[in-house]
Amino acid sequence: MKLGCICGCFNRAFDARTMDQRGFLEHCATTLRVQGVELQDIHFPQTRPVYLQALRRTATDLGLAIVGVGVHNDFGRAATTWRQSEIAKVKQWIEVAEALGAPQVRVFAGHPEGPASERWPAMIAALREVADFAARAGLRLGLENHNHGAFTRTADDQLRVLEDVNHPALGHLLDTGNYTDGWASVERTAHLAVHVHAKFWQVAPDGSEPTIDYPKLIAMLRRRGYEKWISFEYEAAEAEATGIPRALAYLRRLIDAPPGD
């Protein structure tokens, strides 16, 4: 397994303008010492080719893999014009990911406006369309399970979306902290993961996440032959400067430990 870091870990620093994308890359390489980074649409100051080329070159020079780009899309609105604009947005970020050499784009199913059953067919069609586009670009889409009234709050929801879309370019991106029923759905879907977001809502003194059994998760992924990326994701209230290094060190110890420890 390979350890990466999501730029959203530093949302507060980005919002305060004390960190930009280049600074994030440098921090990941020299201070956090992770192998890869996951970027998000909300942190790009621009997407002109010259900027993307420079960003990709910076990551390469620092020895970092850009493992994915996250887009904040929503295919749950009733209005056709809204969905079409969201489809166009996802396609744009697929092109950005391709320019950066990233193999994956994180997507959401979205939040249904009204009954989910009424919005479901259009959401499935939208995901299938962007999956087709990603496939033509040679990329994969990672569908992240999400809460807060989203389509994919439980394992049943996530599995149904993946089955209904039924596209080889759309895979399960497991977010360990987003299922409304917690571990039960994590355990049911971990075997399908093409990518993992290791969420930290809290950080204990030893760096562990009190609400998520990461030793059990890492052991389960290892038994199932998972050798892909685990992207660290920090959303705890504790300051980024203290919470992130402690939590990341804990996660690294679990990943680096010999099997059976």
Regions found by a protein language model. Give the residues of each.
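Conserved, mostly hydrophobic/aromatic
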Residues: 5, 28, 59, 97, ...
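Gly/Pro-rich active-site loop or hairpin
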Residues: 10-21, 25, 81, 117, ...
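Structural motif
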Residues: 31-32, 100, 191, 224
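N-terminal pre-domain/capping segments
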Residues: 1-99, 167, 203, 237, ...
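Active-site-proximal loop/turn and secondary-structure-junction residues that shape catalytic pockets
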Residues: 9-11, 41-43, 72-75, 109-113, ...
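Active-site acidic/histidine proton-transfer and metal-coordination neighborhood
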Residues: 26, 53, 58-65, 76-172, ...
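Hydrophobic faces of well-ordered beta-strands that scaffold small-molecule active sites
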Residues: 3-8, 35-39, 66-71, 105-107, ...
